[in-house]
Each structure stands twice: as structure tokens, then as C-alpha cells.
Amino acid sequence: MILTLDPQVAGASGDMVLGALIAVGADPNRLEEVVHEVSSLGHEVDVHVHEIQKRGIRAVRVEVDAEGDLRDPDELREAVKTVAENVLEDRWRELPELALKYLLRAEERVHGDLCHLHELGSSDTVVDLVGTAALLEDLNPKASEVLPPNVGSGTVETEHGRLPVPAPAVVEVLSEWDVGIVREGEGELLTPTGAALLRTIDELLPDPPPPYRVKRQGFGAGTKDLPDRPNVLRALICEPGGSGEHVRIVETSVDDVDGEAVGELIEAVLQLEGVHDVEVLHGFGKKGRPRFVIRVVTEDRPGIEREVFRELFRWTGTLGARVYRCTRVTADRRIVDVDGIRVKVSRFEDVHHAKPEWEDVRRKVDRESAPLTRARLVGDLRKRYEGDGEDGAGD
């Protein structure tokens, strides 16, 4: 699954990100879990999720009501860390902590110190950051794309007086992030929290491989009613299009490991989330020694190479591995059931193939004592689904 966030029309805020993720299918109960954990720390927080219209666009509005301040940076860090540890799996805990890092760094650069928070300082910040990670964990996208955000224009009234848009804290969050901006509409459209969440999502999830297909869309609503546009953040759920996918390859060579250890290694690596395949090649290394080249193909996810190398080192003692990113071409595929036999039907451009599961064929022939041989049955199934793509090979 690929997640695209489109803040080009009306920018983004923390509550708009939450609403957009719920609108495309994230379970709002995950947000309730976050609110419960924040409340258990002694902060009164409540959340309301409902559907509204923004200039004719149906959108999800998330309202977070929070009482009490978190003006101390260390207290805010500890609250985010504690809530994240209680509701998130390890993989997603980095997101709220990194987003908070960008926010606190922006505060420090703008105001000169971090003794007292100015732009932040409420428990709803914890809900925005950890809640976004919880909803993403529920959706579980493998890649993301964040389009250039609309920052707005003009000036905005703050506790420090009237400031230009984008506000200084927003500019600091956007700095060093390789993204363009849009400047349309009056007023502040991109908040510091919205900017931090967009940046963190963009940086932590890999870019999607082109091409891809849009499956559904949803909108998260902002608070204000804008005079010239719907105040919404759009989210898109997409799927790879079938002709280009990025993968990572982790590869090492060993000449002092026996075949039994390699077999155990293969089994261990295939248990890791995101590993597609493991190949073992035979070759010759230094001084003519026989060696194994172990090649692991994984999804394109930052950090997965460390997970794979941990197992390579555990089972072989290898001192290093080569890691490279490449594109693989894949065919569209689906599984159909034909009289109890699973058939993998694949298509690339105008070429079709069908491959029955051999174990299903064997069981059917053995069980029914059919006069039809296994080879004949396989041939009949392939003939049905190959050729010109009729009888189910097409969409």
C-alpha cells in the first residue's frame, strides 16, 4: 500500500492529518487508545471524530479538546515517549519522536532557548504526533509520497504580534526538507505540527515506485472555513501499478560456513518482515576456496538491511554485507480457484500465464483417482487462462 498526502490546496495541521488518515480507512479506535494513554498521565483530553462538509467536500473532522499545559520541553518529550511506547510497535515509535525533534528544534531556533515552549505546549500535541503514528500503523503503508504543501500568504496574529506567513517556526521545520511549497490563499494554512508530520512521514517511508494506481481517497477537515477553497487535506491510498518496484538487496560472501548453517540462516531470514526471497549461489573466492554468496531481496524500507545483517552475522559471522537498491519489473498477478485448485494467473502487457499449485493438482488426482494425468490436468488449466487473456485472465 502507498500513501499519498496532498496538502497543495489548503496546507495541513495535526488534526487535518488525523482526519485524512481516518478518512482513507484507519481505525479511529487507535486514536482513542492514544487519548486514553495521555489521560492516564493526568492530562484531561477528549477527542471527537465526525464527518462534515467543507465547501461541498465530505471530510472527516477530528477535534481534540485538551486542558493543561506541557510547557516544559523535557515533560513534553517524556509524554510523547511514554504514550508511544504504550500504544505503538517498535517500527512506528520513531515517527512521533522525530516529529517532536523537528518542532523543538524550530522553537529553539526561533526563540533562542527551550526553557519555555511558545508554539507548542499542550497535550493535544501528544495526541497529534502519537495519534498520527497509531493511525499509520493501522494502515501500514509500505511507501509514501508527500506533495508540496500550501503555506498560505499574508500575515498571522500570534502572541508575539503580527508575523509573516509562513510563520518562523514553520519555516524552520521546512528547512533542510527537500520539498517545494505553494503560496496561495490568505492566512496561515500550514501549522508547525502539520509541517513536522508531513516531513517525518515523507522521510521515514520510502518513495513509491512508479507507476501506481489510486484505490481510494479521503479528506481531513481543518477548523477554519476558507473563502476561496475547501479547507481539507487529501489522502490517497494507492497500489503499485505492476511494472516497476524498488527493492533492496543485502548480499554477503562466506567461505568458512557449512551448508547446515546456511540452511538455518535461510529459514531465519525468511521469518523477517519485508524479506521477499533468499538466494544462495556457489562460487570460488580467494585462494580458490569454495564459497557461498548469500543474497537477500527485501522490500524498500529504511533500516531493513540492519535487521537482515543481524541474522547474517548471527549465523555466519560475516563481517560485512553489500546493500544496494534496485528496481525490479513485476507482472500483475492474482489467485483464482478452479474446482479446488489454486491457479496463479499473471499478466504483463499483452502476455498471460497461468500456473496451478502443484500440491493442489497432486491432491486432486490422488484423491479422485482420476484417469486424467497430472500433466494433462495442468495443461488444461494453463490453456484455460493463457493465450489471448480470456476466461478470467484479464481484469
Swiss-Prot record:
Region forming the signal peptide: none
Alphabetized GO MF terms: lyase activity; nickel cation binding
Transmembrane segments: none
A Pfam family it matches: Ni_insertion
InterPro entries xrefs: Ni_insertion
UniProt KW keywords: Nickel
Recorded family membership: Belongs to the LarC family.
Protein name in the entry: Putative nickel insertion protein
Annotated source species: Methanopyrus kandleri (strain AV19 / DSM 6324 / JCM 9639 / NBRC 100938)
